[in-house]
């Protein structure tokens, strides 16, 4: 996970091979379904191509949508609660369709415990060390989001990724450290791969896939210097960084599915 030359893409390929799958099948299938243009860094998997979208208004609307949660419950709940309720309901309604689509793009479902482990480890650590008033917290990061909002929505509010693609205040130091073995690489890869498996309605839909991928653009853009600096300076916490990135697409997909 600490090989900066291609850690994310390399590990995803290793997971595909370990499960008996073709490491090129995912990128090939998705390139056929999502032809897009643009340059992405070597660390980004080949299926995360940057879409050409003039989406300022879309981003603003989506940002507002992501902050709305009438139920008051986030996608990830502690104590054995539901993890992404939409996924379970979607599979229950049409299991054959979901299985067919996921097989078509060479994906395997992730166990529920993988979602829970990544979510709990990343979000709790970030709240404790950054938003919760710890040593790395700053005055500008406290009390800006209502307590009733979902955990990950609160993180997105503070990170301001839609506007700037990175953390404005102390990007490297704001990340929590010391999770170590709590966040296993296999769990992270399962979550990243399962984004496509769990939400085919979003990622294979011409309208929503562009919004979804456009929101990932700041996290992998070559032009986002602060984000590159953040990755460079957190080699000990690279799994944490990638884990937080995995959380954000899931909340976005969940929001789009309910919009």
Swiss-Prot record:
Compartment(s) of residence: Nucleus; Cytoplasm; Cytoplasmic vesicle, Secretory vesicle, Acrosome
Source superkingdom: Eukaryota
Main location: nucleus
Gene Ontology terms describing biological process: negative regulation of transcription by RNA polymerase II
Pfam families: FAM220
A cellular component term, taken from the record's GO annotations: acrosomal vesicle
Coiled coil: none
Keywords, sorted A to Z: Cytoplasm, Cytoplasmic vesicle, Nucleus
GO molecular function, one term: STAT family protein binding
Function statement: Promotes dephosphorylation of transcriptional activator STAT3 by interacting with both STAT3 and protein phosphatase PTPN2. This promotes interaction of PTPN2 with STAT3 and mediates STAT3 dephosphorylation by PTPN2, leading to negative regulation of STAT3 transcriptional activator activity. May be required for spermiogenesis or sperm function.
Assembly and oligomerization: Interacts with transcriptional activator STAT3; the interaction occurs in both the nucleus and the cytoplasm, is enhanced by IL6 and promotes STAT3 dephosphorylation, leading to negative regulation of STAT3 transcriptional activator activity. Can interact with both unphosphorylated and phosphorylated STAT3 but interacts preferentially with phosphorylated STAT3 in the nucleus. Interacts with protein phosphatase PTPN2/TC45; this promotes interaction of PTPN2 with STAT3, leading to dephosphorylation of STAT3 by PTPN2.
Protein name in the entry: Protein FAM220A
Organism: Macaca fascicularis
């Amino acid at each position: 996970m600490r090989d900066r030359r291609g850690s994310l893409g390399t590990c995803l390929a290793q997971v595909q091979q370990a499960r008996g799958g073709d490491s090129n099948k995912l990128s090939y299938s998705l390139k056929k379904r999502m032809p897009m243009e643009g340059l992405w860094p070597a660390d980004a998997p080949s299926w995360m191509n940057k879409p050409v979208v003039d989406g300022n208004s879309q981003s603003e609307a989506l940002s507002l949508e992501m902050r709305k949660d009438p139920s008051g419950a986030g996608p990830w709940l502690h104590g054995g609660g539901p993890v992404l309720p939409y996924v379970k309901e979607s599979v229950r309604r049409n299991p054959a369709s979901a299985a067919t689509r996921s097989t078509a793009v060479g994906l395997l479902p992730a166990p529920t415990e993988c979602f829970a482990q990544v979510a709990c480890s990343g979000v709790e650590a970030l709240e404790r060390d950054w938003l919760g008033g710890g040593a790395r917290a700053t005055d500008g990061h406290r009390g800006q989001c209502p307590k009733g909002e979902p955990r990950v929505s609160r993180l997105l509010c503070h990170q301001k990724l839609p506007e700037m693609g990175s953390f404005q205040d102390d990007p490297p130091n704001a990340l929590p450290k010391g999770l170590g073995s709590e966040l296993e690489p296999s769990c992270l890869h399962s979550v990243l791969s399962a984004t496509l498996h769990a939400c085919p309605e979003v990622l294979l839909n011409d309208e929503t896939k562009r919004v979804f991928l456009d929101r990932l653009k700041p996290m992998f853009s070559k032009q986002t210097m602060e984000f590159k600096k953040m990755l460079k300076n957190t080699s000990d916490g690279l799994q944490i960084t990638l884990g937080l990135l995995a959380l954000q697409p899931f909340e976005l997909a969940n929001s789009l599915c309910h919009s």
